Regions:
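Catalytic-loop motifs flanking and including active-site residues across diverse enzymes
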Residues: 21, 105, 179
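Generic preference for well-ordered secondary structure
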Residues: 9, 35, 39, 74, ...
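Active-site-proximal C-terminal subdomain of hydrolase catalytic domains
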Residues: 25, 29, 44, 121-179
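Caspase-like (clan CD) cysteine peptidase catalytic core
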Residues: 52-76, 80-138
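Boundary/activation segment at the start of structured domains
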Residues: 1-88, 157, 164, 171-176
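Surface-exposed loop/turn and secondary-structure junction residues enriched for glycine/proline
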Residues: 5, 18, 38, 93-94, ...
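Intrinsically disordered, low-complexity segments enriched in small/polar and acidic residues
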Residues: 6-10, 101, 139
Length: 179
C-alpha cells in the first residue's frame, strides 16, 4: 500500500493483488510443499526496515542451519531499475520511485544469500523492472522505460520473474491475481 506510506502517491500506484498473491503463495508453500507456517516469514506492506530485518533474519538462519535447506523468497510489489546503473531494485512501500537506490538491490540480495550455506535458493519476483507498474508508474514516468541489467545468479540459485526487463507485469482482474 504505497499510497498509505508516501505523500503525493495515489492509490493507483499500489500493486493490485500483491497481498493476495503473497497469501496464496504462503498457503501453497504450507499446504502443497509442506513448509511449516513458523518457517514462513510473511510481510505485508513491508517498509525498507522490515524487509532489511527479514533478510538479516534469513541470513542468520542460513548460517545456523542452512547447509542442506532450500530457501524460497517470494516478493510481490514494485520493482524498478536505477536510472544510471540500470540495476534492478525491489521497492518497499516507504521508498519513492524517484529514490530507487534506497530500495533493496536485487543484485545485493542475491549475493548476500548466495554467500551463506544453503541447499537451493529460489527467488520468485512478482514485479516488473521496466519502470512501469502494474497500474501506472510509481514515479509518474508514463511512457518511459528503462531496461534493467540482469543480475548474476549465485551457485544453486533460481530466479523467476513475472516479466522480463522491458515488460510490464499485468493483473488478472477476474481472478484477482498478478500475472
Amino acid at each position: 500500500d504505497y499510497a498509505s506510506f508516501q505523500r503525493n502517491v495515489n492509490k493507483e500506484s499500489n500493486v493490485p493483488f500483491a497481498i493476495r498473491d503473497a497469501e496464496v503463495f504462503k498457503n501453497y508453500l504450507h499446504k502443497l510443499y509442506g513448509m511449516p507456517l513458523e518457517n514462513i516469514d510473511f510481510l505485508k506492506n513491508a517498509t525498507f526496515g522490515e524487509m532489511s530485518q527479514a533478510i538479516s533474519r534469513l541470513e542468520r538462519l542460513m548460517e545456523l542451519d542452512g547447509a542442506d535447506n532450500d530457501i524460497v523468497v517470494f516478493y510481490s510489489g514494485h520493482g524498478m531499475p536505477e536510472e544510471t546503473t540500470k540495476e534492478p531494485f525491489l521497492i518497499p512501500v516507504d521508498i519513492n520511485g524517484t529514490n530507487v537506490s534506497q530500495g533493496i538491490a536485487l543484485k545485493n540480495l542475491m549475493k548476500r544469500l548466495s554467500e551463506k550455506p544453503h541447499g537451493r535458493i529460489s527467488l520468485i519476483i512478482d514485479a516488473c523492472f521496466s519502470g512501469l507498474g502494474k497500474n501506472e508508474p510509481l514515479v509518474g514516468l508514463k511512457g518511459i522505460t528503462i531496461k534493467p541489467v540482469n543480475p548474476e545468479l549465485g551457485n544453486n540459485m533460481l530466479l523467476l520473474s513475472s516479466s522480463s526487463g522491458n515488460e510490464s507485469s499485468v493483473v488478472d482482474q477476474e481472478n484477482k491475481h498478478g500475472l
